[in-house]
Amino acid sequence: MTQVAKKILVTCALPYANGSIHLGHMLEHIQADVWVRYQRMRGHEVNFICADDAHGTPIMLKAQQLGITPEQMIGEMSQEHQTDFAGFNISYDNYHSTHSEENRQLSELIYSRLKENGFIKNRTISQLYDPEKGMFLPDRFVKGTCPKCKSPDQYGDNCEVCGATYSPTELIEPKSVVSGATPVMRDSEHFFFDLPSFSEMLQAWTRSGALQEQVANKMQEWFESGLQQWDISRDAPYFGFEIPNAPGKYFYVWLDAPIGYMGSFKNLCDKRGDSVSFDKYWKKDSTAELYHFIGKDIVYFHSLFWPAMLEGSNFRKPTNLFVHGYVTVNGAKMSKSRGTFIKASTWLNHFDADSLRYYYTAKLSSRIDDIDLNLEDFVQRVNADIVNKVVNLASRNAGFINKRFDGVLASELADPQLYKTFTDAAEVIGEAWESREFGKAVREIMALADLANRYVDEQAPWVVAKQEGRDADLQAICSMGINLFRVLMTYLKPVLPKLTERAEAFLNTELTWDGIQQPLLGHKVNPFKALYNRIDMKQVEALVEASKEEVKAAAAPVTGPLADDPIQETITFDDFAKVDLRVALIENAEFVEGSDKLLRLTLDLGGEKRNVFSGIRSAYPDPQALIGRHTIMVANLAPRKMRFGISEGMVMAAGPGGKDIFLLSPDAGAKPGHQVK
């Protein structure tokens, strides 16, 4: 049956750019990729995009801990994430970042439209403030007990146990993540998105029948409890986009994160030189289909805030949300101590990607059910299904075809009715892929594999091969087996991309969905090479042990400069702004009589002279060598009276001390008096 080609935009939830991809993440990306690959096989135009979610407090905090800028950290993390997804053959058309110019422009556009349409409200709120650090505490700077389900150790914006959202002030017994202090209340003006104005629209969207039943039921609970205005602003310090005309106020990460879907697609369109498609996919009356694959922990944001934001800013809403559950390993939550918190990169050091893709696919359905990765069952299932049923079907027939018939298949099918049984299954299997009933699709395919192997067992080509005058029968039987293998691999192509490549090389033909209607008759195949190797529990044991070792390494004491000289307590931007750093020319440098540590420096600030005592003598035994150098000094440090005179500032140097002191110098071109910003 010929299908009308559709235009489809598919996204996965944006991985947060402060940690590595693990097997929990991979469930979603594999699920989406299998669905996308099936859609492409059916001739649809699919754009599959993702990006790193690169803003927010956790990223800012982790970058501080690492002693690098947030920009540097998210850049390195993006490369790591893309390498992992490529390793699992996730076929993204584009992978971008929310920290991009496209995302900034779209975030500001959506905000301005919401504001123009009256959906942004300003009001002063009482906000938690850290009295020890002298700073307002954004959501992720606060932890406490969830006000809804009473789960402890939850962040200040949403509960990771029950999924509820709330303000940090609603937490029970809140504590500052930064200092551990009990926060106090301070007033601050914030911006709110008027979500209740969209209640009627959202309820109609819920009743449309498109959403999964479990999602629709959960949304109904939220409607019954009443929708609240949503705080979309955060106070500095915050890593993100500053709100236009609101100095010191930033878009909350959950405002610009879903806009990252649009930003990544805009980036893709720009790369293609296609200025039309973005509007075709995102305009209000778009006929393109838009699907978000997400985990059940972020349904609230995607089912309420996101469609309301789009509606209020005159963009189209998603066609549907495809929500999945969590991953457990061996029946329990992934555990670092047990070695079952497994990173994607660690997996690929021990197993191929197709094995996990197959196992997850075999267990997935359209429901929001958790998936258990039982490692022993994983080994048994991959060996039983991929190796014994599918690959073995090719290997047990290919030898005879290659050796006895120079790789040429028979000109007629030995059992046309059996072949028709296989091709007739395309409708049921295709519908299962389409509706995300992946487990059902795999069961149907494996049932066919059993039929194919039973046919070969009954025909016993190894016996026929020894009988005189039965060459034609042998060729027909083995050709039938190879044709059935071709159909099976075509059905499995969305799941097993690397095995498919090897199968296509052997079969000497591309596997296409419609192509199976015509069997390979009189066709020459290539010499058979091993398509897939068996796996065993020793590999699992090595994988688990490697994961444990990674945890130990991550928990090991910091070595190097940070171990001896850890990063100081966090300061606010206002604190830092008080320090006036200037470029200074060293006009003179000399020993200080009576001191074996100090040098007396005469500094020129471009019109003003300063006398500074600096404890760098051990590193610079010849002070004359410093004369004429430019350095950096703290110019507004209060003068300090010393035994040898008054020191009118401080020069900047790095290093642990002793002979390992390194005076800082600006790049060529900096002039005395220039401010360091």
From Swiss-Prot:
Q: Which residue intervals define the domain tRNA-binding in the entry?
A: 575-677
Q: Which cysteines are joined by disulfide bonds?
A: none
The cross-references to Pfam families, in alphabetical order and at most eight, read: Anticodon_3, tRNA-synt_1g, tRNA_bind
Cofactor binding summary note: Binds 1 zinc ion per subunit.
* Ranges spanned by the short sequence motif 'HIGH' region, renumbered to the chain: 15-25
- The catalytic activity of this protein is classed by the Enzyme Commission as 6.1.1.10
Principal EC category:
ligase
Primary residence: cytoplasm
Q: Which residues bind ATP?
A: K336
Q: Which domain of life is it from?
A: Bacteria
Location(s), subcellular: Cytoplasm
List residues binding Zn(2+): C146, C149, C159, C162
One of the record's GO cellular component terms: cytosol
Q: Which CDD domains match?
A: Anticodon_Ia_Met, MetRS_core, tRNA_bind_EcMetRS_like
Q: Give one GO term, molecular function aspect.
A: methionine-tRNA ligase activity
- Describe the reaction catalysed, as an equation: tRNA(Met) + L-methionine + ATP = L-methionyl-tRNA(Met) + AMP + diphosphate
Obligatory cofactor(s): Zn(2+)
Q: Which family does it belong to?
A: Belongs to the class-I aminoacyl-tRNA synthetase family. MetG type 1 subfamily.
> Per its database record, what is this protein's job?
Is required not only for elongation of protein synthesis but also for the initiation of all mRNA translation through initiator tRNA(fMet) aminoacylation.
Q: What is this protein called?
A: Methionine--tRNA ligase
What organism is listed for this UniProt entry? Escherichia coli O6:K15:H31 (strain 536 / UPEC)
